[in-house]
């Protein structure tokens, strides 16, 4: 069986963010999310049909808060408050969950096993032991800086587990 795992391109990520948020989004090559960012980052774990970890997404708190606020049509100040407090409000967390769920579409390709969102880990929650090593590893990954117009920017790191 051939490998059908793919990392989406930056254009696909930008288009998805723009379509979902209804505003201009700029993406550019970025550096990987750092270990020091992990405790306050939003992590999304994606699994295949066998419930095996397929990919992990790390969004720096700044990106998660700004995208969550834009999705909910909240003022930029709502995102800034969450960033200052190093946690997401329940409304922002719900919006970020929806964003992560929609991002699953970038991982599903024809002829490959179905990929689903398994879990979203918010700042302050316990992080599954196997998640961070995959997020930090070199290999098949996409590291971007994503900027949401009139809100702000942050790191977006997506790494395949295989």
PLM regions: where:
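N-terminal auxiliary interaction/assembly segments of multi-subunit proteins
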Residues: 1-162
